[in-house]
């Protein structure tokens, strides 16, 4: 095989491998319970606890499932005051998907009067890079409760399927690439 064909094949394989490593995850906010008002004041920081138990990267999505409620993306000041005058996003369609399109902090609150004050709010930190080891923002409450009305370790949603598929595809892509490189260059 001439060298130009080998170069084209190697470039194709490298490109294929790079695309196979890219994946995004959809997180279901609050796990099975969804976007609800926490049941008690002691659980008022449950959404921030849920967010801190997960790692978010650019391209991931958050799915908010709720009934007779809404979700707003707001500024830090509006988050602290539980009052939004100019939300960046307002949705009340009972199934909102929000794409995390940049690194940094995102602030979410319920748009229903009184819900935010009862703890239906959340800060999500999106990592700078996949290799970053920074932690999401700490809970805004000084009390740390080990029990929560939201499953702490459940990023529920499509994470298990999407992540599993992406990892399988990445592994398969790597193996196929390695076999093709070995066969193209006659290394065996």
Curated annotation (Swiss-Prot):
SS bond list: 82-116
An example Gene Ontology CC term for this record: side of membrane
Tissue-specific expression: Mostly expressed in leaves and flowers, and, to a lower extent, in stems.
Signal peptide: 1-24
Gene ablation phenotype (knockout): Abnormally low frequency of progeny.
Lipidation (GPI-anchor amidated serine): 170
Molecular function as annotated in GO: electron transfer activity
SUPFAM superfamilies to which the protein is assigned, alphabetical: Cupredoxins
Membrane topology term: Lipid-anchor; GPI-anchor
Low complexity composition bias: residue spans: 129-155
Region (Disordered): 127-157
The UniProt record lists the keyword ATP-binding: no
Maturation-removed propeptide residues: 171-188
Source organism, top-level taxon: Eukaryota
Family classification: Belongs to the early nodulin-like (ENODL) family.
Name used for this protein in its record: Early nodulin-like protein 5
Lineage: Eukaryota, Viridiplantae, Streptophyta, Embryophyta, Tracheophyta
Designated gene of the protein: ENODL5
């Amino acid at each position: 095989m001439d060298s130009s064909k080998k170069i084209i094949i190697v470039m194709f394989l490298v490109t294929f491998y790079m695309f196979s490593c890219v994946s995004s995850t959809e997180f279901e906010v609050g796990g099975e319970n969804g976007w609800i008002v926490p049941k008690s004041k002691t659980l008022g920081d449950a959404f921030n606890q849920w967010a801190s138990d997960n790692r978010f990267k650019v391209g991931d999505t958050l799915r908010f499932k709720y009934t007779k409620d809404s979700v707003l993306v707001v500024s830090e000041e509006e988050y602290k005051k539980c009052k939004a005058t100019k939300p960046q996003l307002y949705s009340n369609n009972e199934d909102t998907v929000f794409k995390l399109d940049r690194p940094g902090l995102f602030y979410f609150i319920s748009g229903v009067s009184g819900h935010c004050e009862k703890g239906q709010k959340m800060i999500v930190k999106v990592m700078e890079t996949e290799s970053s080891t920074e932690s999401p923002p700490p809970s805004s409450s000084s009390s740390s409760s080990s029990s929560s009305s939201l499953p702490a370790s459940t990023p529920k949603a499509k994470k298990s399927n999407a992540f599993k598929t992406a990892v399988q595809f990445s592994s398969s892509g790597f193996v196929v690439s390695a076999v093709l490189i070995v066969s193209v260059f006659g290394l065996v």
